[in-house]
Amino acid sequence: KKFEYIHVEHKLRDTSSKEAQDLKKMLKKFMIECKIITWKKKKNIKKTQSDSRDFRFKVFENYCKTKKINTILLGHHFDDFQENFFIRLLRGSGLKGLVSFHNYRNLQRNNINIVRPLLDFSKEDLFYITKNTFNFYIDDPSNRSLEYLRSRVRFMITNLKKNGLDEKKFKMTFENLISSNNSIEYFVQKNISENSSVSLLKKNNGKAFLSLEFFSNTDEIILRSFTKILQDI
């Protein structure tokens, strides 16, 4: 199958435009055509790392819709996965939010598959592969700036590793949380199937009927059940 390569140039740094062109030239040596999409935003509006990620994902999604592509491959690695977990923890995410970073998920609104094939590789692994395959690596200094939450979390994880939180223990904890989340999802589905019915008049226009037993569950099960039913109608 054909692959299309996209690099989003956010213009967050003075050197980013040159780096994007260097990347394009390097990939061309390997017969890879890379499309560069530049983020054009008003100068008086401050760009953040979070805004950049949101924009980048919209670019990928819109590009896939235009080109009728059904799968997006993202370059997230294990370090990203770990950082994302602690960022969500610091923001007060619930169990479902903490375990929502997966190798695969489907965007139902556009039926686009999101695949992260590199989650089992550390940043150090990928750095080694990149240097030895392409002899080329772009270092983003903002990754070390404590101005950004992700960088501060990265520093925190380094200290946690020194105190015993290695990759094996982290993955074990994450798998335990997934198991707990799956148990809750089981009872959510049970609650919906036994204590509710949905009548669809037409697409995105329907009614839901709930029995009193629907509300006899824990708050988390009731909330998740409500959310799923609302998505259906």
Model-derived segments and their meaning:
Residues K1, V8-H10, W39-K41, F55, ...:
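AMP-forming adenylation/ATP pyrophosphatase catalytic core
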